[in-house]
Amino acid sequence: MILHAQAKHGKLGLPWLVFLHGFSGDCHEWQEVGEAFADYSRLYVDLLGHGGSAAISVDGFDDVTDLLRKTLVSYNILDFWLVGYSLGGRVAMMAACQGLAGLCGVIVEGGHPGLQNAEQRAERQRSDRQWAQRFRTEPLTAVFADWYQQPVFASLNDDQRRELVALRSNNNGATLAAMLEATSLAVQPDLRANLSARTFAFYYLCGERDSKFRALAAELAADCHVIPRAGHNAHRENPAGVIASLAQILRF
């Protein structure tokens, strides 16, 4: 079994760009940015519980990283960058810290490196369980209307929120709930020490209006790119800014 993905081929001799979407996204999420890099082969992945991978069950991060490895092998991807947003960024950091053959580097947009104490984890577990129950039992339009009122999305205007609610409501609530619980920050280890001791290139992107993740970025041993005129979902709010940062990173 492998993850559903869309592959687009570029020039030989360049590494692949493997894109991982955020919670409730899918393989289309990164394509506006990724298609600016047509010289590179691109793989747009559907994570477990999402899109074409919605039917794949998940028990924890080990399932996610194992299937990601198998998916890369199935596409014969030998050299690659992982590019992940939010949940996809956390998956990228987890997989990279566990070890991935052929990994050139990791580019994370708004991904959390992990909570640092038991109290924070317990609070996050309570919160994620409540959200998961809502995703399982309530209309997704109602759940996402509240989801996008969370402080991390404060930079969105009403039109942007309505657009995201309509888009995300096409998901399967039960499989979203399973993925939310399986990959909760409550069960993710704190990756700061591993990232400091890494052997791969590591870059971090965050929107200039995303104060929470700008503060987190300052804690990491990463080259940070601040995306102007953007909040938490920088590649959606300012795709040109993210394209410019990726182009700068990939030139090195």
Swiss-Prot record:
Enzyme Commission number(s): 4.2.99.20
Single GO biological process annotation from the record: menaquinone biosynthetic process
SUPFAM superfamilies: alpha/beta-Hydrolases
The keyword Methyltransferase is annotated on this UniProt entry: no
InterPro entries: AB_hydrolase_1, AB_hydrolase_fold, SHCHC_synthase_MenH
Pfam assignment, any one: Abhydrolase_6
MF GO annotations: 2-succinyl-6-hydroxy-2,4-cyclohexadiene-1-carboxylate synthase activity
Catalytic activity: 5-enolpyruvoyl-6-hydroxy-2-succinyl-cyclohex-3-ene-1-carboxylate = (1R,6R)-6-hydroxy-2-succinyl-cyclohexa-2,4-diene-1-carboxylate + pyruvate
Chain's role: Catalyzes a proton abstraction reaction that results in 2,5-elimination of pyruvate from 2-succinyl-5-enolpyruvyl-6-hydroxy-3-cyclohexene-1-carboxylate (SEPHCHC) and the formation of 2-succinyl-6-hydroxy-2,4-cyclohexadiene-1-carboxylate (SHCHC).
Annotated PANTHER family: 2-SUCCINYL-5-ENOLPYRUVYL-6-HYDROXY-3-CYCLOHEXENE-1-CARBOXYLATE SYNTHASE, PROTEIN PHYLLO, CHLOROPLASTIC
Family per similarity comment: Belongs to the AB hydrolase superfamily. MenH family.
Oligomer status and interactors: Monomer.
Name of the protein in its database record: 2-succinyl-6-hydroxy-2,4-cyclohexadiene-1-carboxylate synthase
